[in-house]
Amino acid sequence: MFTGDRSGEFLYRALYEAGFASQPGSLERDDGLVLKDAWITAAGHCAPPGNKPEPEELRNCRPYFERELALLREVRVVVVLGKIAFDTYLRVRGERLSAFAFGHNVLHDLTPALLCSYHPSQQNTSTGKLTQTMLNEVFQRAREIIRSAPDRAEPHPL
């Protein structure tokens, strides 16, 4: 996911700078990129027209998203990229959306911790709404959360 596109350029550089990726970019599936202490998924898995998935796509992908989360172990922080990911993640958890506000680099006191970022879409990065420095700061903060979290070997609490 995000391999070979402009969003991926921003994302993988930030992951690399924070120690979550073995290299600062990924151009193709088998280019040697290895993630460490990280898992990348999406609420919708198809490239949506107009950069926004349709509600039907999100509904269709939700069982896969839920299953992926249920398989993860030792989750200490979830970084959501964009408001759609934020809303979808909270819905999957059964949380009231009105109890949480989305904002860049906003941290929510959940277990695991929930850290928000603007999506690294070409629209956001070309307009300066999201800069490389801003995204790097989010993943550096995620790394700090992991370092300070107590050790545990529990599945993601869904």
Language-model segment annotations:
Residues 144-158:
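Generic C-terminal helix-cap and adjacent flexible tail
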